From Swiss-Prot:
Listed GO biological process terms: tetrahydrofolate biosynthetic process
Purpose of the protein: Converts GTP to 7,8-dihydroneopterin triphosphate.
Protein name: GTP cyclohydrolase FolE2
Keyword annotations of the record: Hydrolase
Biological or metabolic pathway of the protein: Cofactor biosynthesis; 7,8-dihydroneopterin triphosphate biosynthesis; 7,8-dihydroneopterin triphosphate from GTP: step 1/1
Gene3D superfamilies: Urate Oxidase (3.10.270.10)
């Protein structure tokens, strides 16, 4: 059966047929591929995790389509070594095998860090959502992103209320370009200091007392949080560009509060 199939005339390549609309496409490819990757871990050398991967290339105006299967073939080609130090090589392979000028690779994955409760010293794993965003045209570009949960306590509510202050869980999202390698754990530590208190996955009663009192003594607006992060990130000479966002999931309002700052070393 297979031999008979192979004897048939070759199948036409519709993707390579000419498109007459004369419109190039900036990004075309595949999204949301679940795939194992390896991430460098400050304490354990490396960490295996599962990423949701997007892969794109540009498409010249004269081609009807790209070859979608080649994206997955490239992932399988690097199946044992999908890691940060291989991203540029993977992008180069994408450009070569898909005849592209630009290639883009996006990965979102859970990353786990062992955290110690502040008083009981109980240890537990904390999950953080991280992203790798890489592209290759004439040069390689890479952006590391992390979503860091924190607690925020409202300074205005503390000032006005006789019985405490409203507080909530917040998400701070940081993205950085760097000239020298930065550990994910170090970036998490920096951002956690910008809220009213860090968030933990395991707290005993004595820890809860400590965390809530710390938050009360350290009230922060979203504006305070992104400004604190900006001060700390500007002091890191190996960061050439960053963006930082804070979103408070307000406990007494229907809306969320939001603030964002973007800076480059040149500016």
């Amino acid at each position: 059966m297979i031999k008979e199939y192979l004897k048939k005339p070759s199948l036409s390549d519709v993707q390579l047929t000419r498109d007459t609309r004369n419109i190039p496409i900036g990004k075309v490819g595949v999204k949301d591929i679940s795939y194992p990757i390896v991430v460098m871990d400050k304490n354990k050398s490396f960490q295996n995790t599962i990423a949701r991967i997007n892969m794109y290339v540009d498409l010249p105006h004269h081609f009807k389509g790209t070859h979608m299967s080649r994206f997955v073939e490239i992932l399988n080609e690097y199946r044992e070594e999908i890691a940060l130090d291989k991203l540029e090589l993977i992008l180069s392979t994408m450009k070569e095998k898909l005849g592209a000028s630009n290639a883009h690779l996006e990965m979102e994955f859970p990353y786990f860090v062992e955290k110690t409760a502040p008083v009981s010293r109980a240890k537990s794993l904390m999950e953080y959502t991280c992203t790798f965003s890489a592209s290759l045209s004439d040069r390689f570009d890479f952006v590391l992103g992390i979503k860091v949960p924190v607690t925020s306590l409202c300074p205005c509510s503390k000032e006005l209320s006789s019985y405490g202050a409203h507080n909530q869980r917040s998400i701070m999202t940081v993205q950085v370009r760097y000239s020298e390698f930065i550990w994910i754990e170090d970036l998490i530590d920096i951002i956690e200091e910008c809220g009213s208190s860090p968030v933990y996955s395991l707290l005993k009663r004595e820890d809860e007392k400590f965390v809530t009192e710390r938050a009360y003594e350290n009230p922060r607006f979203v504006e305070d949080m992104v400004r604190e992060a900006t001060v700390r990130l500007l002091n890191m000479q190996n960061i050439s560009w960053f963006s930082v966002e804070a979103e408070n999931f307000e406990s007494i309002h229907k809306h969320s509060a939001y603030a964002a700052i973007e800076r480059s070393r040149e500016s």
